[in-house]
Regions:
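The conserved acidic donor/metal-binding loop of glycosyltransferases
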Residues: 97-101
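Catalytic-site signature of metal-activated, phosphate-bearing donor transferases
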Residues: 71-78, 82-85, 103-322
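Short beta-strand/loop segment that forms part of the nucleotide-sugar
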Residues: 26, 31-40, 61-63
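Short, well-formed alpha-helical segments that are part of the catalytic scaffolds
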Residues: 12-29
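Active-site-proximal specificity loops/subdomain of glycosyltransferases
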Residues: 3-6, 10, 41-95
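A short acidic, amphipathic alpha-helical/loop segment
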Residues: 21-22, 47, 109, 113
Length: 322
């Protein structure tokens, strides 16, 4: 079995992503690692090119994203992942984002499970445990799904994209999504239907326990924490650092992610305090000091927050430690 890892990068230096550690972890258990750059202008692409000169397992390419396109979100995410995937020459593919890491202790477990799935041709897509850090003080979120799709068979019909039932078109024929996808679903290119996948556990049971833990049930919270620790011991686990530096994440949301989601879902949202889920003021009035103060408070008073609604400081969200 040959295992290909793949990922995408864009201005990772300026955005302070742990991209080098992420790619190094892929190199630790993959036979090749394919990386597509979206047109970085902060030195990321140049550093990747230098790295490529000394690392024989790296396969790199650049596809410059047009950030003025109305569908730049889909172009820079789902489609860009597909471009990276199509560089893969292995039997199996492992996709990872550049704010995710597999630790060295999990390399052998990862290879063993990949080989097991490779020898079961009925499985085309497999999920793996995920822990998402909230701040730098050891909190792990319980308000997000504890898994991600990561291992797939290198079937050339499989791409990343918007499932057909959630795909819409603008008047200029560019594509956007309805709520329910981030454009990175594993779908079949010809039918735009979702690729069936295998879960690593009884996720209905775990999500029910997680819901009770989120609601404040201490017994459920203890069970969920012990289950998470057990999964980490048994299976390779994705460690997600998206919210590890909350201040950085909020700054990125101000400059990029708020526009990204408008592009993804074809929304036009005015910059008002009512539409800002993080602050009671428009983004144009938010200062770096505002961001620093909010990040400190979120890290110390909350265990996570999904910013589909304004922060409710009276509803203290739960977290676990591992």
């Amino acid at each position: 079995m040959k295992l290909s890892g793949y990922t995408t990068v864009y201005n990772c230096i300026n955005n302070e992503y742990p991209w080098e550690d992420s790619i190094k972890s892929l190199l630790g258990f993959c036979d090749e690692v394919c990386v597509v750059d979206g047109g970085s202008d902060d030195g990321t692409w140049e550093k990747l090119q230098e790295w490529n000169k000394t690392e024989s397992k790296l396969v790199i390419d650049q596809y410059i994203v047009d950030w003025n396109r109305p569908d730049f979100a889909y172009e820079s995410d789902g489609r860009q992942k597909t471009r990276s995937r199509k560089l893969c020459s292995g039997d199996m593919c492992w996709q990872m984002d550049v704010d995710e890491i597999i630790v060295q202790e999990d390399y052998e477990k990862t290879r063993n499970i990949c080989l097991e799935i490779y020898n079961n041709p009925q499985i085309e897509l497999m999920t793996f445990p995920l822990i998402e850090y909230w701040g730098s003080n050891g909190k792990v979120r319980i308000d997000v799904n504890p898994w991600k799709w990561r291992l797939s068979r290198n079937n050339p019909k499989i791409i990343h994209g918007i499932p057909g039932d959630l795909l819409k078109y603008r008047e200029d024929n560019t594509e956007y999504a309805l709520q329910g996808t981030d454009s990175c679903d594993y779908i079949y290119e010809d039918t735009k239907t979702r690729v069936p996948f295998v879960l690593f556990c009884d996720m209905n049971k775990i999500n029910n326990i997680r819901a009770h833990a989120n609601a404040g049930n201490q017994q459920a919270l203890d069970f969920y924490e012990n289950w998470t620790k057990s999964m980490i011991n048994q299976m390779p686990t994705i460690r997600h650092y998206s919210w590890h530096n909350i201040e950085r994440k909020i700054k990125n949301y101000k400059t990029h992610w708020s526009k990204f989601w408008c592009s993804m879902y074809n929304k036009s949202i005015d910059d008002t305090k009512e539409n800002n889920m993080m602050f009671d003021k428009p983004w144009s009035e938010v200062t770096d000091n505002d961001i620093k103060e909010l990040a400190f408070r979120l890290e110390n008073e909350m265990g996570g927050w999904i910013f589909h609604q304004k922060i409710d400081w009276d509803r203290k969200t739960k977290s676990i430690t591992i």
